[in-house]
Amino acid sequence: MGTNGVRVFVILYLLAVCGCIEYDVDDNVHICTHTNVSHINHTSWYYNDKVIALATEDKTSGYISSFIKRVNISLTCLNISSLRYEDSGTYKGVSHLKDGVIVTTTMNISVKANIVDLTGRVRYLTRNYCEVKIRCEITSFALNGSTTPPHMILGTVDKWKYLPFPTDDYRYVGELKRYISGNPYPTESLALEISSTFNRFTIVKNLNDDEFSCYLFSQNYSFHKMLNVRNICESKWKALNNNDNASSMPASHNNLANDLSSMMSQLQNDNDDNNDYSAPMNVDNLIMIVLITMLSIILVIIVVIAAISIYKRSKYRHIDN
């Protein structure tokens, strides 16, 4: 289909008929009724039983945010451009005619998509050393006629992990012929993670050691993405150099600041390992902890000085007596 538009005309009077048509990502779809526009008083358009917009003779109002830039709605047609996977669902137009007749147009849309997210996140970084966590997550996979569960592999030629997809009933949507992520099974069941370390001054002899691939394959279909992880480290090292060159601070202060920055990054990354989706550390809380610690130290010093002074006075008074 490519990006060519496909026009579907369905005429329904006081009846609701549902058909299912599959589209590819970036296709355009037009759902219309043949009813003469001059006979229509107003039309309400729905997506999964939620109102998208209300079209009248004068205007169309009530667009939901995710459709604003890609949808054109009128009394007779619902036009969606550049389909996305999440656009899959049931669309319905209910036209109220001026003579009291109601015309209902309903269409099930299934958008075929293989959504594979392959990302790399730096866990630890110094001027010479870089550790990256590589994560591959499958959020949608079209079976394309396959009768066997798909599998996924993440890694390089020499270092990789393997995972068969779960085949639980709630992971498979029969109408869409697709394994999808979502409740109640955790999304992590369709994700693999692997860590790799890089030395800045190591001579790269085999580029395959830097290229990580995420393979998704089934009986008659395969799909993969590639990511050069060393490039992620190189960009971080370059940023460190730029910061050093741009800074006017003394070298010792630079080193201290970089060490503190590395320590804070390591603490944050360790926290991320426990919960990859947790919020960043609250800066206000961190400042408060530092202030309380400093005040405690100052208080201890004052108490010690006071104790020494009292002791000396007591000793001198004893000598005088």
Swiss-Prot record:
**Signal peptide extent:** 1-20
- Which residues carry attached sugars according to the database record? N36, N41, N72, N79, N108, N144, N220, N245
SUPFAM superfamilies in the record, alphabetically? Immunoglobulin (SSF48726)
Q: How does it sit in the membrane?
A: Single-pass membrane protein
GO annotation (BP), single: viral process
Q: Please indicate which superkingdom the organism of origin belongs to.
A: Viruses
- Gene Ontology CC annotations of this record: host cell plasma membrane; membrane
What Gene3D superfamilies does its record include? Immunoglobulins
Q: What are the alphabetically sorted keywords of the record? A: Glycoprotein, Host cell membrane, Host membrane, Membrane, Signal, Transmembrane, Transmembrane helix
Location of the protein in the cell: Host cell membrane
Q: Which InterPro entries match?
A: Ig-like_dom_sf (IPR036179), Ig-like_fold (IPR013783), Poxvirus_F5/I6_dom (IPR007674)
Looking at the UniProt entry, the stretches that span the membrane are 286-306
**Inducing or repressing factors:** Expressed in the early phase of the viral replicative cycle.
Q: What does this protein do?
A: Plays a role in the spread of virus to neighboring cells ex vivo.
> Any idea what this protein is called?
Protein OPG049
